[in-house]
């Protein structure tokens, strides 16, 4: 270790060690170049990179912060990952043998023997008053995660399942294969509702951005090129505007809901109460409106007008802390340069979190949070619990740690004996 040559440094995103052959790819069209046990190096990942990410021994990206796609998905997959490594794709060479120490954010030349810390094997608390949910998307991880001490799935992302289908839904519709898309999506959702039953599974309807949809097979034909997809054609607005594709999704939800009553439906990136009311009507007409409607709160307008949104009639609210933080602070969550400014503990964000939780509590609406912040900042978790949050959702690698944090906070507050 003393003589190890340090090649690249970046931000630790998913802890662990990985050793293997570097494979540099420019986009997801080159996914097949990444074989089992390779070190995936790229500028930035998107949902269509997932097949390659699952095969990688470790992942290194030039750009990104701890809430970027590569960071979130690698933690869920349990793959070591370093983000924001600047010129990694220029410094490292395809075929080069390296060791990735993702716990400390370092890449070394060759096969370096690094001792890893022992991981926690059990939680101190079997149960807490505040529910702990998992953020999940990969069906292959379901048996393992369903056996862990979690109270359900707080965020099942549609994008992972759709990326696995691999084709743009409009392309499948135009080819007369819309029913095939619906059945494949239903099969994916059913994997989760069945494994976690009777624990609830909160399914977030598709929230691909246009640049991500374009990467699906046939996507170039249907997706506009936007200057800023993050605040572009996405979320509830898209679902109303692209009714044909949304119908494929609601058909899948209706199929699953007939079999499993633990399914919940959550609408992402809602901008106005009027928009929410229209989506709710679509869901009611599609026969899935009775399955406990949730909304994501990630746009500042939703925080400010929360009472108006709740008046539309929702059963649950999930705080999308990653998008809410970046939109409140005007910082790019995918930028390594802005990493120090991206902080969920900023007073403006904390004000928003308190307002959301206390308003929901007053109105008798379930409120949760999805994101990494409660795992990173125990002091923030203490605030969330004290304000009355009902549940916290984290990626699978943070389940035991977060259960302990919640338990310690509740014990300190006298909630647990």
Across the structure, where does each feature detected by a protein language model lie?
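Conserved alpha/beta-domain cores
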Residues: 123-417
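Acidic, glycine-rich flexible loop/linker segments
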Residues: 2-156, 166
């Amino acid at each position: 270790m003393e003589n190890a040559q340090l090649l690249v440094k970046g931000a630790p995103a998913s802890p662990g060690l990985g050793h293997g052959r570097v494979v540099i790819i420019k986009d997801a069209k080159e996914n097949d170049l990444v074989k089992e046990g390779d070190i995936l190096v790229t500028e930035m990942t998107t949902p269509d990179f997932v097949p390659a990410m699952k095969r990688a021994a470790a992942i290194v990206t030039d750009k990104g912060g701890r809430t970027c796609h590569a960071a979130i998905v690698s933690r869920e997959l349990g793959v070591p990952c370093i983000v924001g490594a600047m010129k990694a794709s220029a410094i490292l060479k395809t075929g080069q043998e390296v060791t990735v120490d993702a716990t400390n954010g370092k890449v070394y030349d060759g096969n370096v023997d690094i001792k890893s810390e022992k991981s926690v094997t059990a939680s101190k608390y079997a149960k807490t008053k505040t529910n702990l949910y998992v953020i999940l998307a990969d069906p292959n991880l379901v048996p393992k995660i369903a056996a862990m001490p979690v109270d359900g799935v707080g965020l099942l992302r549609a994008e992972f399942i759709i990326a696995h289908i691999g084709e743009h839904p409009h392309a499948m519709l135009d080819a007369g294969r819309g029913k095939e898309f619906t059945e494949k999506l239903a099969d994916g959702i059913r994997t989760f509702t069945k494994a976690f039953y009777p624990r609830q599974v909160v399914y977030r309807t598709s929230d691909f951005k246009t640049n991500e949809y374009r990467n699906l097979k046939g996507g170039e034909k249907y997706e506009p090129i936007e200057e800023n997809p993050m605040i572009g054609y996405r979320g509830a607005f898209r679902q109303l505007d692209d009714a044909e594709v949304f119908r494929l999704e609601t058909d899948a939800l209706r199929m699953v809901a007939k079999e499993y009553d633990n399914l919940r439906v959550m609408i992402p990136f809602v901008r106005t109460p009027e928009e929410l009311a229209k989506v709710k009507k679509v869901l009611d007409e599609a026969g899935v409106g009775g399955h406990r409607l949730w909304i994501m709160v990630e746009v500042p307008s939703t925080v400010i007008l929360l009472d108006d949104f709740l008046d539309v009639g929702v059963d649950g609210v999930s705080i999308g802390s990653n998008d809410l933080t970046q939109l409140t602070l005007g910082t790019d969550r995918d930028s390594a340069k802005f990493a120090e400014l991206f902080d969920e503990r900023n007073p403006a964000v904390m004000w928003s979190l308190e307002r959301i939780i206390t308003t929901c509590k007053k109105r008798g609406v379930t409120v949760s949070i999805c994101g990494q912040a409660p795992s990173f900042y125990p002091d923030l978790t203490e605030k969330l619990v004290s304000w009355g949050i009902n549940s916290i959702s984290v990626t699978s690698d943070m389940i035991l740690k977060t259960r302990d944090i919640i338990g310690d906070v509740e014990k300190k507050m006298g909630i647990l004996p």
